[in-house]
Amino acid sequence: LEDQFYLGLYYSTLTSSPENYNQNKFSSTLNFGFIRDFPFNEQRNFGVGVGVGLSLSSSNSNLKLSDLNSSVSGEIVNSEDFTKNKWNTTKIEFPFEVRWRTSTPTNYKFWRVYFGVKTSYLLKSKYKYESLNSNYTLENLPFRKTQSGITVNAGNNTWNLGLYMGLNP
């Protein structure tokens, strides 16, 4: 196994969303960090990885957020009524993975499969709305501070395909 720096770009989508909710433009997550390997066998091809990283997410949709008496509410609006409607989050993340690969001490082109759990802590959140009639920004949105999800990564050589499914609504 090997320690690794990681860099990932994910397409973000909601699996449970309000009626008439639509994502528009490209909603994405960029994450990067470091994972330390702890091998379980002499071949060093099975073990666990523990790490720390940073996650930057941007979500574009027709869900308009408003601040009403220090309480944030949301409503579905027509996508043609605004020019910008997105929220951004910054999180510190802590991945834990069970790791298996076909590597040998001399072969660096190998298959890999990693299953794991990622826990993250929300550091910052920001919402921006722009239309012909209204422009405003909200910060420190009432999102859950601690979030967890299941991860699956599989790949060959230097490329991986990764999936993340959040466990918290």
Where are these regions (language model features)?
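Short loop/turn motifs that connect adjacent beta-strands in outer-membrane beta-barrel proteins
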Residues: 1-3, 39-46, 103-111
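N-terminal targeting leaders of membrane proteins
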Residues: 1-8, 12
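Surface-exposed strand-loop-strand hairpins of Gram-negative outer-membrane beta-barrel proteins
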Residues: 12-33
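Structural signature of outer-membrane beta-barrel domains
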Residues: 12-14, 53-59, 118-124, 166-168
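Outer-membrane beta-barrel proteins
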Residues: 13-15, 35-41, 99-104, 158, ...
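Extracellular/periplasm-exposed beta-strand and loop segments of Gram-negative cell-envelope proteins
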Residues: 18-25, 59-69, 74-89, 122-132, ...
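Residues on the lipid-exposed face of transmembrane beta-strands in outer-membrane beta-barrel proteins
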Residues: 32-38, 52-54, 94-100, 115-119, ...
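Predominantly the C-terminal beta-signal and adjacent terminal strand-loop region
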Residues: 139-169
